[in-house]
């Protein structure tokens, strides 16, 4: 379904629910296009607060604050999808008359719940997934063991990110422990994919149905957290194009307005399996900030504001390396001295273990992304803790 609403003029207010680094970088992109940004978040120390024109500090469950926020902005978007269900219902029924909500509440409700997401992909598309089961109690848990066999991964249906909310189970003892410790129920049991690599595609769709895809990229994770992205993925053109087509299919089926990250596995037989969907800017799209004329944040703001979408092209190959926790931040002086490193820091004051503090992009001439040894040499000081070393 196409939305024929007019484009927002400069000076309009973009409302962003969530105050993390994705909201921060979205706000900066909005300012470049002449928009003001109003952040709704629960903490005054969140990264996006520093760059916003207006800020509401309130609980995501505060209906009064949500209503005032909706009345003060021209469009609402989201920097994370794990927003309380009651909040989404209130926005749908009590706030949609005040402003646009992009992407739609339906998109968030579908993608914030693994069961709903997998059911949607199975029923609305022909896109392949790893075998999975819905687990509500011990009986369905036994059926999952029978269907999937060990090992498999047990996951919470909601609030899983950066490796949280899941356990790798190899036997009944580990399974029973995981079933008890993972909350809330219900859970998802999912087969372990013997994958050759992990990929993702950023796809953006406008209010009038125009679709743009950035290049397919390859991702490396370290303890469940994205460590590094290679753009473009060093794969055959056929596989890269297939991954983009999968992302397009999902965006169309969701009637998406805005940007979305689609994470996939490439298995060892050459088949692609969708892993997760994130209807927002995504960590694996940060390479676009320096390797493309229009990055993922520019494209998202353009889409939700009803502006024309340029083509999602890159002028350079790129490595994106996350700066995670106190170990990486201790290297910051050397990072800042390294020629060719383009740092992006998120303004977080405390570097806790596993916390994303920023990222570094490194560019190469188009078509000249190095191999593993060249990547290690390029990253230098940052190569001492990288997924390539696993």
Where are these regions (language model features)?
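ATP-binding N-terminal substructure of ATP-dependent carboxylate-amine bond-forming enzymes
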Residues: 1-112, 116, 139
């Amino acid at each position: 379904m196409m939305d024929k609403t007019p484009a927002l003029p400069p000076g309009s207010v973009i409302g962003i629910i969530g105050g993390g680094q994705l909201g921060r970088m979205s706000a900066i992109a909005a300012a470049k296009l002449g928009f003001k940004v109003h952040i709704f978040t629960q903490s005054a120390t969140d990264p996006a607060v520093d760059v916003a024109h207006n800020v509401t500090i309130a609980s995501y469950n505060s209906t009064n604050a949500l209503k005032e926020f909706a009345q003060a902005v021209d469009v609402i978007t989201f920097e994370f999808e794990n927003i309380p269900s009651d909040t989404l219902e209130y926005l749908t029924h009590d706030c949609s008359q005040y402003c646009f909500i992009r992407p739609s509440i339906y998109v968030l409700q579908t993608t914030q719940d693994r069961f709903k997401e997998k059911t949607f992909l199975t029923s609305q598309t022909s896109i392949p997934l790893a075998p999975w089961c819905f687990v509500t109690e011990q009986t369905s848990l036994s059926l999952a063991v029978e269907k999937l066999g060990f090992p498999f991964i047990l996951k919470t249906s909601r609030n899983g990110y950066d490796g949280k909310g899941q356990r790798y189970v190899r036997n009944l003892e580990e399974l029973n422990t995981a079933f008890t410790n993972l909350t809330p129920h219900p859970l998802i049991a999912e087969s372990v994919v013997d994958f050759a690599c992990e990929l993702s595609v950023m796809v953006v769709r406008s209010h009038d149905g125009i679709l743009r895809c950035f290049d397919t990229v390859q991702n490396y994770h370290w303890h469940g957290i994205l460590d590094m992205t290679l753009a473009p993925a060093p794969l055959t053109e056929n596989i890269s194009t297939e991954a983009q087509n999968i992302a397009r299919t999902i965006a169309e089926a969701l009637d998406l307005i805005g940007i979305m990250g689609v994470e996939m596995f490439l298995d060892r037989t050459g088949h692609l399996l969708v892993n997760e969907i994130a209807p927002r800017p995504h960590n694996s799209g940060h390479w676009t900030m320096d390797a493309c004329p229009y990055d993922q944040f520019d494209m998202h703001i353009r889409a939700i504001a009803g502006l024309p979408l340029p083509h999602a092209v890159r002028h350079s190959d790129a490595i994106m390396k996350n700066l995670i926790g106190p170990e990486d931040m201790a290297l910051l002086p050397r990072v800042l001295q390294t020629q060719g490193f383009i740092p992006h820091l998120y303004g977080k004051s405390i570097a806790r273990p596993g916390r994303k503090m920023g990222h570094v992009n490194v560019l190469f001439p188009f078509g000249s992304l190095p191999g593993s040894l060249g990547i290690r040499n390029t990253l230098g000081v940052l190569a001492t803790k990288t997924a390539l070393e696993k």
